[in-house]
Amino acid sequence: VRDAYIAKPENCVYECATNEYCNKLCTDNGAESGYCQWVGRYGNACXCIKLPDRVPIRVWGKCHG
């Protein structure tokens, strides 16, 4: 498990406005919790706490969406 920005298959973050949206997205994918990181490295993006290794995360490189 790891704390990370959850990613779509094309290495793009899930953009967000609320913590509730991200918490649901993250917990639905097996994380302990989630939050909306405002004005972070990838803009307003969902970050997950203790996200399982099987779930894709945002890695270095371009978003191909």
From Swiss-Prot:
PROSITE patterns, alphabetized: LCN_CSAB
Entry's Gene Ontology cellular component terms: extracellular region
Coiled coil segments of this chain: none
GO MF entries: sodium channel inhibitor activity; toxin activity
Transmembrane annotation, as ranges: none
Compartments where located: Secreted
GO BP field: defense response
Domain LCN-type CS-alpha/beta: residue ranges: 2-64
The entry's keywords: Disulfide bond, Ion channel impairing toxin, Neurotoxin, Secreted, Toxin, Voltage-gated sodium channel impairing toxin
Cysteine-cysteine disulfides: 12-63, 16-36, 22-46, 26-48
Tissue note: Expressed by the venom gland.
Main location: secreted
Disulfide bond among keywords: yes
Function description: Binds to sodium channels (Nav) and inhibits the inactivation of the activated channels, thereby blocking neuronal transmission.
Free-text comment on this protein's domains from its UniProt entry: Has the structural arrangement of an alpha-helix connected to antiparallel beta-sheets by disulfide bonds (CS-alpha/beta).
Family affiliation: Belongs to the long (4 C-C) scorpion toxin superfamily. Sodium channel inhibitor family. Alpha subfamily.
Protein name in UniProt: Neurotoxin BmK-M3
